[in-house]
């Protein structure tokens, strides 16, 4: 027996078999050790595939061989000096391998020959091979073909297998090992795919759909059905290989190297009628590997697709299919389109329930059913630029991840105690150096507190560790249950009824009962940790994604909506009609009565300057989103020229800036829940109004990239100063009705009827009176009070007399409240800053703003007790 004649794979297998024999304390290397190595290690996958093609039930054979290996006699070695040698049976089989290689006129002994030699021997391995259902004649033909063609061709069975292992991923093998997520629903799409695959010609389906709808999942579902024998006879022995295009391209240094690799893959796939090639992102094939004058990958697969030699399934998106595949008519006609639509909310919930166990096992948390329903409904409502079920799955995944981080981190109560203990220890160390009585007394008090805190910490820490241990026990039980279910599926496939019975009626019910008891026990005892995902965590994650306040997502704002006018009036003074109109629109939207295909509301604010048009927009942004930053403010004076209109939607193709995002559409794509303020709308070019017609009517807009932008969750507010010149010249500012009629006439003359008719409400703001200005001044001064408080001046206030004095000086019916801000700066902020810098006003004491002899004065007191004072 010459080992140098064995191929590299066979030599490695013999070395691995020797290691297994040593590990199991066996005295000799037996043939079953070699077979166990072939079946166990992934690097010998070609042997496994050979056995499958020869009709062997590989799973059953593996279990039988493993059992025989475990039952072999053991001879334990204390010092490890015993040498393991080949048994007489193995030597006979190896000699027979040499004889068979000579019969096939081969100078090299391949590992595949070992199977024939083992089958012809009288060893126990021969019995196991025959029991597995192997067909001897078919095996000999396959090996003979391998041996006879090796020296001449490079396309032998073994080399084909190695090429496929290098450049593809076996999806059916992943399904067999239970490494794929379960595919729930999608029965119609999978059935349609099977139907196309069974056709005589054009049996190559291409799955087309938006990103995230589950195209790849359908192929995985098909692989699972193949493993479970739930497909027609023509597909029962098939396997699905996913093409790894990155592996094909990686390391291709020279021209033609990619084409050579790809041609080998195509040849290997076409030689096996039971192999289906899956090309994810099919559009990548168009242009892949193409250099000057050479063919790309798509042109290489066309002939094989046309002749029916290649069984192929593709997947791509709608946009990329139209951009790449449809342009090549010859390539398009060789595929049969299957459109994958987005599942509805009910189907998404079913999908999430099916995936629930996998995510629970991964994160070691419990995902409640309300969380699943919330993930499907909220993602559908608030995330408009992605598809179900992908966005709902991501919500569940991230929410479960946040709970897992909390479990792994130290609880807040424990962390607070830990920091307090460190602080007390530092103080005690410092006080030990002092010798006065006060320090000693303080040290005694701190030592008692430290002892108490350490005791509390010890109790809490032990409880935290116990709760964590309980959660990890649950995870281990879930993991064991998952493994048991996987083995049950494998036993069902190979028909091992004894093991099926043991698992189905013994092991699995026992683990399920154990899991139920562990969960019930942990729920009663949990105080520091929380191991379940609820709709609150889903809403928190969604709030971080979209910037929408969590209270709004969870619909906890009913009282807030009912009192919306009161809240807005705290910031906007004297505009009851405008506040009422805005509040009604928001309430209609929240109650679900408004048209879902239009913006929440579209308004035009008219009136003289300085009456609160822009301020109302800021107040609305604060009310809806708890921030002023949720407002997209566009100054329409920047769009007076015709060429500047393209900035709203983006530059057309061929122009500089085509790739960069548009101002309006890009802002809404990134933050779909916002207020769009179109300031001074009358200054915009007429083409801007043509764009706005579609937004106001349909709630959507298409940008220069062809992407649909959804405006259904925006509030569109346009402000205008139309008619303000007439107001200043002809009318008494207090005559509101006349002023409103005049302004509306001007608006109707300026804007086209189709634009006016699409606006929900046109609001003419009321002019401000001296009473309104007093309230506005008080609001403005509150911002000053907060800044003073930060500088160390608490409880700043102003007298009624001083407030009236400022309001009278700042009152101008033509300019509204804008002059008031300048008056506050001039009369209060400027002199106040001088006094602070000159130390006339000391920190830590209150400041009262008063008026004496028509001059503002600042009085500093320890306590303010004047009832005639506005206090922050």
Swiss-Prot record:
Pfam families: AAA, AAA_2, AAA_lid_9, Clp_N, ClpB_D2-small. It comes from the Bacteria. Residues 3-149 form the Clp R domain. Residues 162-342 are annotated as: NBD1. GO terms for cellular component: cytoplasm. ATP 2 binds at residues 607-614. Residues 6-72 are annotated as: Repeat 1. It is found in: Cytoplasm. Residues 393-525 form a coiled coil. Residues 768-872 are annotated as: C-terminal. InterPro entries: AAA+_ATPase, ATPase_AAA_core, Chaperonin_ClpB, Clp_ATPase_C, Clp_N_dom_sf, Clp_R_dom, ClpA/B, ClpA/B_CS1. Keywords: ATP-binding, Chaperone, Coiled coil, Cytoplasm, Nucleotide-binding, Repeat, Stress response. The Clp repeat (R) domain probably functions as a substrate-discriminating domain, recruiting aggregated proteins to the ClpB hexamer and/or stabilizing bound proteins. The NBD2 domain is responsible for oligomerization, whereas the NBD1 domain stabilizes the hexamer probably in an ATP-dependent manner. The movement of the coiled-coil domain is essential for ClpB ability to rescue proteins from an aggregated state, probably by pulling apart large aggregated proteins, which are bound between the coiled-coils motifs of adjacent ClpB subunits in the functional hexamer. Homohexamer. The oligomerization is ATP-dependent. This is Chaperone protein ClpB.
């Amino acid at each position: 027996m010459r080992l140098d004649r064995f191929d590299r794979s066979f030599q490695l297998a013999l070395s691995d078999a020797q290691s297994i024999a040593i590990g199991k304390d066996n005295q000799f290397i037996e043939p079953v050790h070699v077979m166990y190595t072939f079946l166990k290690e992934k690097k010998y996958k070609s042997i496994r595939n050979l056995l499958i093609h020869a009709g062997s039930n590989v799973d059953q054979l593996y279990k039988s061989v493993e059992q025989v290996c475990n039952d072999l006699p053991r001879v334990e070695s204390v010092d490890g000096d015993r040498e393991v040698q080949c048994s007489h049976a193995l030597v006979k089989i190896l000699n027979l391998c040499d004889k068979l290689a000579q019969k096939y006129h081969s100078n090299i002994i391949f590992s595949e020959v070992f199977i024939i030699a083992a089958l012809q021997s009288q060893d126990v391995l021969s019995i196991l091979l025959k029991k597995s259902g192997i067909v001897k004649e078919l095996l000999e033909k396959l090996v003979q073909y391998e041996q006879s063609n090796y020296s001449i061709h490079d396309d032998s069975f073994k080399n084909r297998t190695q090429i496929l292992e290098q450049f593809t991923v076996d999806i059916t093998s992943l399904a067999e090992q239970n490494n794929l997520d379960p595919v729930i629903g999608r029965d119609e799409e999978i059935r349609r795919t099977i139907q196309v695959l069974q056709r005589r010609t054009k049996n190559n389906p291409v799955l087309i759909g938006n990103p995230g709808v589950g195209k790849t999942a359908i192929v995985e579902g098909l692989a699972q059905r193949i493993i479970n024998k739930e497909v027609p006879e023509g597909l029962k022995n098939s396997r699905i290989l996913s093409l790894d295009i990155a592996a094909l391209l990686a390391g291709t240094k020279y021209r033609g190297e990619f084409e050579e690799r790809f041609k080998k893959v195509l040849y290997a796939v076409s030689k096996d009628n039971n192999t289906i090639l899956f090309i994810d992102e099919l559009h990548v094939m168009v242009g892949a590997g193409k250099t000057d004058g050479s063919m790309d990958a798509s042109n290489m697969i066309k002939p094989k697709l046309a002749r029916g030699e290649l069984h192929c399934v593709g997947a791509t998106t709608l946009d990329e299919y139209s951009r790449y595949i449809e342009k090549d008519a010859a390539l398009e006609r060789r595929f049969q389109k299957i459109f994958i639509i987005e599942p509805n909310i009910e189907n998404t919930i079913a999908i999430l329930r099916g995936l629930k166990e996998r995510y629970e096992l991964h994160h070691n948390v419990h995902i409640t059913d309300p969380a699943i329903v919330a993930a499907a409904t909220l993602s559908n409502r608030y995330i408009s630029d992605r598809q179900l079920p992908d966005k709902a799955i991501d919500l569940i995944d991230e929410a479960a991840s946040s709970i897992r981080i909390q479990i792994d981190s130290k609880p807040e109560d424990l962390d607070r105690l830990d920091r307090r203990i460190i602080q007390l220890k530092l103080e005690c160390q410092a006080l030990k150096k002092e010798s006065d009585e006060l320090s000693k007394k303080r040290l005694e008090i701190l030592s008692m507190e430290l002892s108490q805190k350490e005791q509390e910490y010890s109790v809490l820490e032990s409880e935290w560790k116990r709760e964590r241990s309980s959660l990890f026990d649950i995870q281990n039980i879930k993991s064991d249950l998952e493994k048991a279910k996987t083995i049950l599926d494998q036993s069902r496939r190979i028909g091992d009824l004894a093991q099926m019975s043991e698992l189905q009626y013994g092991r699995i019910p026992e683990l399920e009962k154990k899991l139920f008891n562990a969960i019930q026990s942990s729920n009663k005892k949990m105080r520091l940790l929380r191991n379940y995902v609820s709709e609150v965590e889903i809403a928190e994650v969604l709030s971080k994604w979209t910037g929408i306040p969590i209270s709004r997502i969870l619909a906890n704002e009913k009282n807030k909506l009912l009192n919306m006018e009161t809240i807005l009036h705290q910031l906007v003074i004297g505009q009851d009609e405008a506040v009422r109109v805005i509040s009604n629109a928001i309430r209609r939207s929240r109650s679900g009565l408004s048209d879902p295909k239009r913006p929440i509301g579209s308004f035009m604010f008219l009136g003289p300057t300085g009456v609160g048009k822009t301020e109302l927009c800021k107040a609305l942004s604060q009310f809806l989103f708890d921030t002023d930053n949720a407002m997209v403010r566009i100054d329409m004076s920047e769009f007076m020229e015709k060429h500047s209109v393209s900035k709203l939607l983006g530059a057309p193709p061929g122009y500089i800036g085509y790739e960069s995002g548009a101002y309006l559409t890009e802002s809404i794509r990134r933050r779909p829940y916002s207020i769009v303020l179109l300031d001074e709308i009358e200054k915009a070019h007429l083409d801007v109004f043509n764009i706005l017609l579609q937004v106001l009517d349909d709630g959507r807009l298409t940008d220069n990239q062809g992407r649909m932008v959804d405006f259904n969750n925006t509030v569109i507010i346009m402000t205008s100063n139309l008619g303000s010149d007439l107001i200043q010249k002809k009318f008494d500012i207090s005559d509101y009705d006349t002023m409103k009629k005049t302004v509306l006439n001007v608006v109707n003359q300026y804007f086209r009827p189709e634009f006016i008719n699409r606006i929900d409400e046109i609001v003419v703001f009321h002019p401000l009176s001296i009473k309104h200005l007093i309230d506005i001044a008080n609001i403005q001064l509150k911002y000053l009070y907060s800044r003073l408080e930060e500088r160390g001046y608490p409880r700043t206030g102003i007298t009624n007399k001083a407030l009236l004095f400022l309001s009278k000086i700042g009152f101008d019916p033509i300019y509204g409240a804008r002059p008031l801000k300048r008056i506050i700066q001039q009369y209060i902020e400027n002199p106040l800053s001088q006094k602070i810098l000159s130390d006339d006003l000391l920190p830590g004491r209150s400041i009262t703003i008063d008026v004496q002899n028509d001059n503002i004065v600042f009085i500093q007191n320890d306590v303010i007790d004047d009832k005639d004072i506005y206090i922050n």
